[in-house]
Every structure is written in C-alpha cells, then in structure tokens.
C-alpha cells in the first residue's frame, strides 16, 4: 500500500500552483509564464482533478447515503483516497508527501465534497491537524509525525475547541503545567473531528497561568499521541449532517507530554493555531462549493425530468430564474476560494480573502441546498432523494473553522484597517 501511495506521489508531484479554470469553461491554449492572469489548469492539475472526480462519482456517491444512515466511519473510502494520493497533500516532499499548494488541495476537496461532505470532512480534518506541524514543527517532529502518514493511512486531529470556548479560542481552559522535561496537561476538548480515529492530535493549551497574559504568549501548541495515558476519548456524537465523520469530546487528565513535542516554543501556540486557518479555510470553502455544485446539478436534472402543468419544471420561468441564481452563486463562490488559495500559494497573507471565501461559500452552500429541496418539492423532503442530505450537511460549513459571524468580524477588521492605515 505504501508503494502505491508513493507511485501516486510521483505522478502528481509535478502539479503547478499557478492557474485554474472553472469546471464549466472550455479549455484554451495555456498562456506563457508571466503573461498575466489565467483560469487554465495545468495538464497535471486536470489529471488530479479528474482522479478525485472519478473517485467521488464512482466510489463515494453510491455508498454515501448508507454511511449517512449508519453513521459508520468510512474506512474503506479513506484508505482508497490515501492510495490515490488524495489525502495528506500538504505534507512536504522531504517527508514522502506531495508538497502541494492550497489551490491543488482545493481542487481535490471540491470534488470529494461533491460526493459526500462527511467523507471530505474526515479527509480535511487530517489536513487541519497537519498544518500546525507544517508551519510550526521542527524537522524531527515533522519526520516522526508527518512522515509516517505517507507510509500508512493514519489520521490526526486539530484539538482546540472546548465546551466553553468555540469561537473564543483565547478563552480555552485546558492547562499545560511544565514539570521538568514534561508538561502535564489537564482539560476537556469538544467537537473534535477525527477525535476517535486520530493517531495523534495538535493540542492547544494554556501554559501561562496568568489570566492577564496576552493570547499571543499564553498558549502553547503540543503534539499529543492518542494512546498517551490519561487521554480519554468520548462517545461519537450524532450530528445533524456529515454523519459519517467522527466527532467526539476528549478529556486530558494528567497527560504527560515531553517537551520535544512542543511546537516552535512555549507561548507560540495561539499564533500557530490561528495561522493554520489561512491555509485551511480555502479548502473548507472549496468543500462548500462542491456541495453547492451538487445541489445545483441535482436540481437541474430534476427540473429537466419533472413535469407540472404540462411542461418541464425548467420551462417555468420561476424555476429557471432560481436555477440561474444558483449558478451565479456557485461560480462566484468558486472564484472566491480560488483567489484565497492563490494568495497564500503566492506567499502573501490571505486572511481577508480566506474569510471572504469561507463565509460566502458556506452561505451559498446552505442557500443552494435549500433551493434544491424546493425544486424537488415534497420529494426533496424525503430520504429517497439526495437533496435532503445536502441540506443537513451544508449547515456545519457556517459553523466549523470559524462561524459565519466570526468571518465577518475578520473581514470588517481587515477591510476597515486598510483605510485606517
């Protein structure tokens, strides 16, 4: 299996981080480097996108409803995604990974989410757990924890949210007390995706006991192995949507973590945790776009099959205008995540664009899922049809990795700050 993954890496490693095109535009001759803006994907990117699309259509969609019904963790699909090189795409080449940019992973994420956002979220949660190590880990940490994920299909998780601290990350209560060459961690985390399946966690804890200490210095990021004594994994939560992903609470009781597992240094955790979102919010937005595209496609196909008052639904102006609005929204949301991904891949700070992409794509995913149910009418409210699942799955995009309201706070701060400066 590891050999298969490495072959996938060799095929896909040459992906370019420049240029893309909307999935509905015709290909045009590629522009020469430096000739200006282009929507065209490279041939390798098209191949990567096609691989993810084929996997989603042929292997995810046929079983998505059953996984949603049972809530079972989709182990066979995750193993298959790993074999195809569709997981762990951010891991640097020096540790056996693809070393892809954000736009490349967004292309994959949109296609996977089209098939099932529960499966996509399980995969994306791996990225969320890995990015803190990529931006804040040293060579030894990356080799040990990232390197082995390219040898076998392991999982990890981003362990930050608590029962009393969601959007208010600075309000977390989990404490890390240094004793000799170790830290003793005590606290409780909540809503941890992959919580019961992860082999290790990125954990954020308060290391400065002074309640007045600034967030930029009060918190430390740790790598915590899931089988460490004192780690108590809670029951799987039964959620509204994305039911096949694994979400749990985790208790840390006198968990001993060696100082070698501190990322960057004591007090650097908050910066690492927040910096992670600049890289992960564009793919989250891409996932929302994948769901929105699925909603549009399902609604359009149904409108071209169902007849009322002697003609197809799509021939009624009210429905055709609804589909037109849906199409506009999904294309604009796709552009927003592409801009955010391009900015970070170009080495620029993308906080503003990442929040715009995340907020807008999450909103339109919910709007389009609701509209798709409306087009289906009574059938849309029934589990025999796919759109009710889309409506349930969409809501979490407005909540996880920063709520819709938090994104607007960030956007307003960034926007107004430009005028003040």
Curated annotation (Swiss-Prot):
Enzyme Commission number(s) of this protein: 1.3.8.7
Family recorded in the similarity comment: Belongs to the acyl-CoA dehydrogenase family.
Naturally occurring in which organism (per UniProt): Sus scrofa
Active site: residue positions: 401
Coiled coil (residue ranges): none
Positions of modified residues (Phosphothreonine): 351
Cofactors demanded by this protein: FAD
Primary location recorded for the protein, binned into one broad class: mitochondrion
PANTHER family documented for this protein: MEDIUM-CHAIN SPECIFIC ACYL-COA DEHYDROGENASE, MITOCHONDRIAL, MEDIUM-CHAIN SPECIFIC ACYL-COA DEHYDROGENASE, MITOCHONDRIAL-RELATED
Top-tier EC class: oxidoreductase
Annotated compartments: Mitochondrion matrix
Protein name stated in the entry: Medium-chain specific acyl-CoA dehydrogenase, mitochondrial
PROSITE patterns: ACYL_COA_DH_1, ACYL_COA_DH_2
Modified residues (N6-acetyllysine): 79, 212, 217, 259, 271, 279, 301
Record's GO cellular component terms: axon; mitochondrial matrix; mitochondrial membrane
Glycosyltransferase in keyword set: no
Gene Ontology annotations of biological process type: cardiac muscle cell differentiation; carnitine biosynthetic process; carnitine metabolic process, CoA-linked; fatty acid beta-oxidation; fatty acid beta-oxidation using acyl-CoA dehydrogenase; glycogen biosynthetic process; liver development; medium-chain fatty acid catabolic process
Modified residues (N6-succinyllysine): 179, 212, 217, 259, 271
Alphabetical list of SUPFAM superfamilies matching this protein: Acyl-CoA dehydrogenase C-terminal domain-like, Acyl-CoA dehydrogenase NM domain-like
Binding-site residues, octanoyl-CoA: 167, 216, 278, 281, 349, 351, 401
Assembly behavior: Homotetramer. Interacts with the heterodimeric electron transfer flavoprotein ETF.
Post-translation changes: Acetylated. Could occur at proximity of the cofactor-binding sites and reduce the catalytic activity. Could be deacetylated by SIRT3.
């Amino acid at each position: 299996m590891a050999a298969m993954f490495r072959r996938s890496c060799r095929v896909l490693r040459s992906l370019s981080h420049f240029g893309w095109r909307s999935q509905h535009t015709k290909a045009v001759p590629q522009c020469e480097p430096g000739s200006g803006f282009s929507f065209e994907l490279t041939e390798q990117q098209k191949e990567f996108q096609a691989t993810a699309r084929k996997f989603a259509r042929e292997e995810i969609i046929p079983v998505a409803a059953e996984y949603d019904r049972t809530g079972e963790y989709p182990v066979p699909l995750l193993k298959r995604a790993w074999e195809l090189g569709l997981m762990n795409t951010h891991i640097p080449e020096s540790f056996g990974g693809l070393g892809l940019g954000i736009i490349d992973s967004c292309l994959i994420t949109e296609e996977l989410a089209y098939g099932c956002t529960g499966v996509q979220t399980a995969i994306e949660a791996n990225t969320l757990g890995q990015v803190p190590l990529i931006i804040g880990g040293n060579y030894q940490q990356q080799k040990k924890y990232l390197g082995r994920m390219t040898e076998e299909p392991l999982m990890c998780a981003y362990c930050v949210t608590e029962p009393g601290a969601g959007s208010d990350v600075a309000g977390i209560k989990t404490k890390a007390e240094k004793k000799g060459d170790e830290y003793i961690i005590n606290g409780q985390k909540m809503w941890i995706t992959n919580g019961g399946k992860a082999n290790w966690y990125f954990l954020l804890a308060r290391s400065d006991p002074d309640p007045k200490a600034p967030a930029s210095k009060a918190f430390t990021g740790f790598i915590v192995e899931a089988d460490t004594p004192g780690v108590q994994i809670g029951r799987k939560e039964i959620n509204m949507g994305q039911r096949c992903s694994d979400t749990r609470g985790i208790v840390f009781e006198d968990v001993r973590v060696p100082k070698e597992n501190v990322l960057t240094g004591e007090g650097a955790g908050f910066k690492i945790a927040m910096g992670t979102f600049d890289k992960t919010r564009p793919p989250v937005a891409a996932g929302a776009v994948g769901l929105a595209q699925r909603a549009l496609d399902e609604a359009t196909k149904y409108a071209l099959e169902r007849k009322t008052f002697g003609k197809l639904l799509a021939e009624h102006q009210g429905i055709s205008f609804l589909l037109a609005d849906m199409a506009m929204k999904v294309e604009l949301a796709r552009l927003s995540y592409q801009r955010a991904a391009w900015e970070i891949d170009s080495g620029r700070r993308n906080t503003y664009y990442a929040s715009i992409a995340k907020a807008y794509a999450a909103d339109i995913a919910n709007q389009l899922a609701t509209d798709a149910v409306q087009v289906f009418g009574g059938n849309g409210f029934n589990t025999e049809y796919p759109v009710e699942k889309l409506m349930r799955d969409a809501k979490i995009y407005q909540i996880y990795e920063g709520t819709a309201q938090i994104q607007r706070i960030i956007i307003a701060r960034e926007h107004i700050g430009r005028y003040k400066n």
